[in-house]
Amino acid sequence: MRNTDKRWDMIFMSHTLEHIVNPCDFVRKCEKMNTRYFFIEVPTFDYKLSNEPFGMFCEEHVNMFTLESLQNLMNECGYQLVSADFNINVTSKLPAGSPAMKTIWEKPFKKKYQFINNSKNILCEYINDSENLLAEVRKRIAEIDEKKKLAIWGTGHHVSMLLANTDLLDKNIVKVYDSDRRKYGQKLNGCEIGAFSENDIIQGNVQAILLATYTAQDALEKILETYQNKVEVIKLY
């Protein structure tokens, strides 16, 4: 962080702290430039949807916070909590950024407020629910006929998780689709990544399509409605 003699009444930090390797050291450096208030917005682990893919909250994040853990951090750095609001959008399907909490902190630290929630219990419950969901996903993939010509639609970190934790590699993968043109020409499991082509279905080159994405699953399913009698569409969630 650049040295400066300037000081601000409020520091505003939105969806930043989860990317910082040493958040305590970072906040302490910010504190030297701050006279009173600190606004922090981060994804929260206090509320997680257990029907999300296992661990998909971790996209480029090196830290995950509950209000309890964030309070411990900010108290250590000389701040006390003024207010906290939780934004829970159950239809967003963006595990990496939602739900989120918006908090305001004030210095100097005077009193710590004790919350009933327990971060360890929340984490254990999340792991238990997610392992149950992953077992269902494994079962669905195991049921895919190994003789069928399978296309995978989606090449993000979610499909990497599937390749590592299921027997997807044992299937007859012949095509890989993605909507991101920047990935075209690259390979996944020996197949070149490209755009979806209806000719693959019409010509019989693809017999089943696995929707290997959580955030875009509904949108892709709608695209494939036209071909529902010609190709098997496999959803995981």
Regions found by a protein language model. Name each.
Residues 1-55, 59-79, 105, 177-184, ...:
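Conserved SAM-binding loop
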Residues 39-41, 83, 151-152, 235:
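A structural signal for short, well-ordered beta-strand segments and their strand-loop junctions
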Residues 47-48, 91, 160:
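Generic structural signal for helix capping and beta-alpha/helix-loop junctions
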Residues 78-80, 231-232:
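Charged, glycine-enriched surface loops/patches
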Residues 79-90:
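Conserved S-adenosyl-L-methionine
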Residues 88-93, 104:
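N-terminal juxtadomain amphipathic helix
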Residues 97-237:
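Hydrophobic, well-ordered beta-alpha structural blocks that scaffold small-molecule cofactor pockets
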